[in-house]
C-alpha cells in the first residue's frame, strides 16, 4: 500500500495536539484521543470485497508514551531524550494498492457523499492523476545512504546486564511476568532512508514492512510478525516466539523442533 498527499495530519507530544489540513494548522492542549476518534468517525469507507483490505484511512505510529492518554494515572518515568512524538498519524484518501502475487495495482480515491456527482468526478480525476504518475514518472534517483559515524549503543554490555538482573528481580517479586528490554543504537546518517527501505525489501522481504515520512522523521522496518490485524470487525494476531538454529540434517531439525515445542518459556509466550 502506498499513500500520498495526506488529507490531514494529527500529531501530539506531551498533550500538545497539532492538526494540519487544507484549512491550516490548529493546536490544542489536550489528549489526542478524542480528535483521533472523531477523525475515524468522520472518514469511513464502505466495505467492498472487490478491493484490498485497506482502502484509505489513518497511517502512522503510536509511541510507547502514548499510554499516558489511554491508561488513567500513568505517566512515563523514562527520560525523553529521543524527542519523538507520542503519536503521528496521516489521513490518506488516495491509495495505490499493489498485489505482488497477481501483478496488479489498485488505484483508490475516496470521496465524500454530500455532493455525490461533483465528488465522484473529482475522485475520477484523482485516479487519472495516479495513473499518470505510474505511467509517466521516472523512478526517483535516491542518494545512497551513508553512516557518518560509528553506531553507538545507549547502554554498554555491563549496563544492559544490570537491566536484565533487575528485570529478573521484578519477575521474582511478582511485579511483572514479562518484559522486553531494548538498546537503542545511534549514528550520524546522510541520505534517504527510503533507499535503505528498498534494500530491506529486496534482501529481507517480510509479511510486515513499512516506511513512513513526516517532516524530519523517517521510519522504516521489516518484521516476520504482524502484531495485530483488524478485519471484518475481528482482531487477528500472529505471535512469533522462540527460535532455534537450523540443524545440520533433518534428524537434528526434528530434535530442535521437539525441544522448542516442549520449552515452558516459549509456550508461555503464546498464551
In which residue ranges do the predicted regions lie?
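Extended alpha-helical targeting/anchoring segments
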Residues: 1-271
Amino acid at each position: 500500500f502506498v499513500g500520498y498527499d495526506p488529507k490531514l495530519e494529527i500529531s501530539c507530544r506531551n498533550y500538545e495536539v497539532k492538526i494540519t489540513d487544507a484549512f491550516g494548522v490548529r493546536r490544542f492542549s489536550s489528549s489526542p484521543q478524542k480528535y483521533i476518534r472523531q477523525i475515524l468517525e468522520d472518514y469511513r469507507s464502505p466495505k467492498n470485497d472487490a478491493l484490498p483490505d485497506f482502502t484509505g484511512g489513518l497511517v502512522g505510529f503510536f509511541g510507547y508514551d502514548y499510554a499516558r492518554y489511554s491508561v488513567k494515572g500513568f505517566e512515563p518515568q523514562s527520560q525523553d531524550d529521543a524527542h519523538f512524538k507520542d503519536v503521528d498519524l496521516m489521513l490518506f484518501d488516495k491509495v495505490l494498492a499493489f498485489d505482488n502475487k497477481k501483478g496488479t495495482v489498485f488505484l483508490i480515491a475516496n470521496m465524500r457523499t454530500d455532493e455525490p456527482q461533483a465528488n465522484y468526478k473529482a475522485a475520477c480525476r484523482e485516479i487519472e492523476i495516479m495513473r499518470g504518475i505510474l505511467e509517466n514518472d521516472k523512478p526517483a534517483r535516491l542518494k545512497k545512504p551513508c553512516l557518518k559515524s560509528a553506531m553507538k549503543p545507549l547502554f554498554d554490555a555491563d549496563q544492559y546486564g544490570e537491566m536484565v538482573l533487575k528485570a529478573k528481580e521484578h519477575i521474582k517479586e511478582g511485579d511483572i511476568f514479562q518484559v522486553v528490554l531494548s538498546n537503542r543504537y545511534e549514528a550520524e546518517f546522510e541520505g534517504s532512508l527510503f533507499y535503505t527501505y528498498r534494500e530491506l525489501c529486496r534482501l529481507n522481504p517480510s509479511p510486515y514492512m513499512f516506511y513512513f515520512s513526516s517532516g524530519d522523521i523517517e521510519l522504516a522496518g521489516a518484521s516476520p510478525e504482524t502484531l495485530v490485524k483488524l478485519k471484518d470487525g475481528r482482531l487477528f494476531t500472529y505471535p512469533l516466539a522462540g527460535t532455534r538454529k537450523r540443524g545440520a540434517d533433518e534428524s537434528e531439525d526434528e530434535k530442535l523442533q521437539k525441544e522448542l515445542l516442549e520449552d515452558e518459556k516459549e509456550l508461555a509466550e503464546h498464551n
